[in-house]
UniProtKB/Swiss-Prot annotation:
The name this protein goes by in its record: ATP synthase subunit alpha, chloroplastic
GO molecular function: ADP binding; ATP binding; proton-transporting ATP synthase activity, rotational mechanism
Record site: Required for activity: 363
Catalytic activity: ATP + H2O + 4 H(+)(in) = ADP + phosphate + 5 H(+)(out)
Cellular component, GO, one term: chloroplast thylakoid membrane
Primary location group: plastid
Compartment annotation: Plastid, Chloroplast thylakoid membrane
Aminoacyl-tRNA synthetase is among the record's keywords: no
Enzyme superclass (EC): translocase
E.C. number: 7.1.2.2
Any Pfam family matching the protein: ATP-synt_ab_C
Membrane-related topology note: Peripheral membrane protein
Length: 507
């Protein structure tokens, strides 16, 4: 018979008491009243925060957007096909956040920062809130460094600086994405991290852009955030904020970043869909009342950090689509008022073969020449005025039969300048090449050539200058000034190349 010793029993009881875990886990739960169209109505969830993540029984995540007196309106981050009426929901106590790290470079991810390129998981050790406050006034400094796009029309007349927000606006199929992707290609070797956010686009279009980046070696410094047209509205609405959080991660590490939102019209439409389904009152064009805040809180995150914060920068190029050139619609006017200028792409110019189809007359950069190197200021100062006068003259010349010699000369010069601004896609130019091109046009060296010969001559001149007068490029890149020596070298090269070119044409 086993004898029971009292001291052993007391030891066992004491051990049990010591191991007893008094921690009580409180979970805030609710039940689904109604679900459908990417929206769920939840009863309960008494202490849920606005924007808090909630988790359904079958693991779908949602965001609590509407906090009403008797229920909570939740938008789903998934199809939610397995969610049933009466199933339970629990609040997670977290606001939407994503993991961030340098390992995201070269990857294609979705709005939840999950990789969708089939190249495995991304290792991260840090996370950032998707929505974080924009830098304050003290944390910023004024924009002073240029961010070269590689497009002559933009870098000479509508310059963009690091930390600026410049809107790209135009009808569908006018080359808006091409301007943005060319800008990314031109950042090669410039130590700029690029984030391309595709919102509500065709998967084939996004694949095309990614392939082009890979072929040109641009994916090394680029992150693509993609939510295609078949994604839930919630994810299309979140995608730009995810991109901004990734760009901010690098900005606060004293790096320069460029972020492209392609396009914010689709994000506004996704937000409108969510708001109407949540029964929020519609306003102008059926958009909810806070659609301005939707874009302002996103674009205000782009900044040039002060020297105290390491002078990093985040440059934003939002894209907005217009309907038959109507810039006075709701979303275009909102975004124009938030940004520091706009590049207007015209369908008429595009169809007339002027590409990039930038309407220089109504495009503007509110940073202006502060975002240009001295050499570009010296050369391009008169260009915008000359083109504006030419456009006016051209309209007038359609009605006049006999024009005086001076007017004819001005028209001829304008036609050649317009020819210089044409550029094939995915062929960005260096600043030195742009300066050479503009100088050649504005100083009348092309006036003797036929319009059809202008581009051929300029291409040959670029090659000639590179091989025979390489000092020109060195002077501009080192001094950032169009010195007398550089001008003499360029004049020499133009004259030598012009002689060769005319001989070739005669042969």
């Amino acid at each position: 018979m086993v004898t029971i010793r009292a001291d052993e029993i007391s030891n066992i009881i004491r051990e049990r008491i010591e191991k007893y875990n008094r921690e009580v886990k409180v979970v805030n739960t609710g039940t689904v009243l109604q679900v459908g169209d990417g929206i769920a109505r939840i009863h309960g969830l008494d202490e849920v925060m606005a924007g808090e993540l909630v988790e359904f029984e079958e693991r779908t995540i949602g965001i609590a957007l509407n906090l009403e007196s008797n229920n909570v309106g939740v938008v789903l981050m998934g199809d939610g096909l397995l969610i049933q009426e009466g199933s339970s929901v629990k609040a997670t106590g977290r606001i939407a956040q994503i993991p961030v790290s340098d390992a995201y470079l070269g990857r294609v991810i979705n709005a939840l920062a999950k990789p969708i390129d089939g190249r495995g998981e991304i290792s991260t050790s840090e996370s950032r809130l998707i929505e974080s406050p924009a830098p304050g006034i003290i944390s910023r400094r004024s924009v002073y460094e240029p961010l070269q796009t590689g497009l002559i029309a933009i870098d000479s007349m509508i310059p963009i600086g690091r930390g600026q927000r410049e809107l790209i606006i135009g009808d569908r199929q006018t080359g808006k994405t091409a301007v943005a992707t060319d800008t990314i290609l031109n950042q090669q070797g410039q130590n700029v991290i690029c984030v391309y956010v595709a919102i509500g686009q065709k998967a084939s279009s996004v694949a095309q852009v990614v392939n082009m980046f890979q072929e040109r070696g641009a994916m090394e410094y680029t992150i693509v955030v993609a939510e295609t047209a078949d994604s839930p509205a919630t994810l299309q609405y979140l995608a730009p904020y995810t991109g901004a959080a990734l760009a901010e991660y690098f900005m606060y590490r004293e790096r320069h970043t460029l972020i492209i939102y392609d396009d914010l019209s689709k994000q506004a439409q996704a937000y409108r869909q969510m708001s109407l389904l949540l029964r929020r009152p519609p306003g102008r064009e059926a958009y909810p009342g806070d659609v301005f805040y939707l874009h302002s809180r996103l674009l205000e995150r782009a900044a040039k950090s002060s020297s105290f914060l390491g002078e990093g920068s985040m440059t934003a190029l939002p894209i907005v689509e217009t309907q038959s050139g109507d810039v006075s619609a709701y979303i275009p006017t909102n975004v124009i008022s938030i940004t520091d200028g706009q590049i207007f792409l015209s369908a008429d110019l595009f169809n007339a073969g002027i590409r990039p189809a930038i309407n220089v007359g109504i495009s503007v950069s509110r940073v202006g020449s502060a975002a240009q190197i001295k050499a570009m200021k010296q050369v391009a100062g008169k260009l915008k005025l000359e083109l504006a006068q030419f456009a006016e003259l051209e309209a007038f010349a359609q009605f006049a039969s006999d024009l005086d010699k001076a007017t004819q000369n001005q028209l001829a010069r304008g036609q050649r300048l317009r020819e210089l601004l044409k550029q094939p896609q995915s062929a960005p130019l260096t600043v030195e090449e742009q300066i050479m091109t503009i100088y050649t046009g504005t100083n009348g060296y092309l006036d003797s050539l036929e319009i059809g010969q202008v581009r051929k001559f300029i291409v040959e001149l670029r090659t000639y200058l590179k091989t025979n007068k390489s000092q020109f490029q060195e002077i501009i890149s080192s001094t950032k000034t169009f010195t007398e020596e550089a001008e003499a070298l360029l004049k020499e090269a133009i004259q030598e190349q012009m002689e060769r070119f005319l001989l070739q044409e005669q042969a």
